[in-house]
Amino acid sequence: MKSVVTTVVTAADAAGRFPSQNDLEAVQGNIQRAAARLEAAEKLAAGLDAVTKEAGDACFNKYPYLKQPGEAGENQTKVDKCYRDLGHYLRLINYCLVVGGTGPLDEWGIAGAREVYRTLGLPTGPYVEALTYTRDRACAPRDMSPQALNEFKSYLDYVINALS
């Protein structure tokens, strides 16, 4: 799984060298942000169901057409799948917070996601909207410290950009 540490070590090994000063500074910065990332991961895990429901509800309220026949949320089974997928993205963000890199999202969430959604005729816009709602609603200190919130929002932005 890709993280800052594994990326640095892999690049240095491929070049047949030791990590450079810049490499080591990147690793050090990543380690210094670890406490904030772990706080964000803990808070997200504790509130995952509520965050997922609130974001999904906001999305379906903004795009009520999604519940019409022939759309992604035309019946409760499909609505439940939308919430499941949204929860999956949030869980992957949790994993990214733990490892300190985008590996979980890259490997399990983004690679091919747009192609799968396109093939199945599912729009990515509602997922982007739900994740954007989550990003914009989260605040410090209500939800987590400012540093933890910064880390959380950076991974939300990453997946939002990837699905846009």
Swiss-Prot record:
UniProt-listed Pfam families: Phycobilisome
InterPro entries: Globin-like_sf (IPR009050), Phycobilisome_asu/bsu (IPR012128), Phycobilisome_asu/bsu_sf (IPR038719)
Annotated compartments: Cellular thylakoid membrane
CDD domains: PE_alpha
Membrane-protein topology: Peripheral membrane protein
GO cellular component terms, semicolon-separated: phycobilisome; plasma membrane-derived thylakoid membrane
Record-level GO BP terms: photosynthesis
Entry binding sites for (2R,3E)-phycoerythrobilin 2: 139
Keyword Thylakoid: yes
Family: Belongs to the phycobiliprotein family.
Assembly and oligomerization: Heterodimer of an alpha and a beta chain.
Official protein name in the record: C-phycoerythrin class 1 subunit alpha
Protein's organism: Synechococcus sp. (strain WH7803)
Encoding gene, per UniProt annotation: cpeA
